[in-house]
Amino acid sequence: MKTEKVFLYDNLCDPDLQEELFGEKFDSDQYMDYVTDWDLVAIKINGDLRKVAIEGGERTTIIGHVNYVPLEKLNIMDKHYGKEFIRIKVTTMLDSDCSLYIKRTDKIKKVI
């Protein structure tokens, strides 16, 4: 099965939530990894407070995991994040080339 490496840093790191939303738990690297040069802001999505990565602003280090998402699940994940997010290519601090979902900055309202 072909997969794409996706850096997950929010509630999608939870294997139980992955199974609920996508019908399976994704394989992931067992160690924590990090991405830098992104800002992490709190916003409300469907009434829930979530932290999301955005370009620009304050640069921070985001902690998460590299997950191996089956290619046939990427469209479902894209729909989960919605049109206000884009999937970009990044390299983590542990040298893993992967995708990262970031919030489109033209569509953001910070709450914190």
Region annotations inferred by a language model:
Residues 1-112:
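Glycine-aromatic micro-motifs
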